Amino acid sequence: MKIDEITVEGYKSIKSLKNFKLNNINILIGANGVGKSNFISIFKMLNFMFSKNLQQHTQDKGPDSFLYYGRKTTEKIYLEFKFGNNGYSVTLALTQNNKLIVERENIKYYSSTEWINTLGTNMLESRLSQATKYAYSKKIAQYSLGGIKSWKLYHFHDTSDTSKIKGVCAENDNLILKPDASNISAYLKRLYSEHREYYDYIVYNISQIAPFFGGFIIRDSEIYN
């Protein structure tokens, strides 16, 4: 499900970004260090929260690295996502024992009024993946959960010699495209064989940037790149 708006406060280099509207395609343009990667990393953090690995994610680099200019300037992070008539918000707070915890977590529904259901407060880990257990309305929780689970983060910019996108993969590793694109060759071959219209659409869009591109080389092999 498409995200309509996002609000970010106190996260890394982002002091305050309120009700930022997102379209079907959004391009972030700016010099190195202005916060493009930090904006994308919000969704990486959300993935860790969903899998109950917030502490692992934040302790590796230290909670201060996630706060805007560290704890001397910022004590809390606030994230809010609006999608359709539904929403999700979370406040992360720094504790005295140097942990970033979930101070408050809500799922929301927007109609004539804003319906807010708090999933929990002052928790080491998020309850997002268990929203149907803690929400008053199971139906709204299921819908919100389904929307959030559909968001996938793909990070393809690594073009080094050790990049996984340049590695080999098994031909049958093609059900879903992995976030690091390590199985992109197998996935493209499946599109070519079973969903040609999507494959052709990819080739067409690449050719708009590189007119000389005519398609990928498709060959049969159990392991290939």
What do the PLM-derived regions correspond to, one by one?
Residues M1-K15:
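N-terminal pre-Walker A segment at the start of P-loop NTPase domains
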Residues L17-N23:
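Phosphate-binding P-loop
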Residues A31:
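P-loop (Walker A) phosphate-binding loop of NTP-binding proteins
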Residues K36:
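Conserved lysine of the Walker
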Residues I40-K99:
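Conserved P-loop NTP-binding catalytic core
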Residues S221-N225:
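Short, intrinsically disordered, charge-balanced linker/junction segments flanking boundaries
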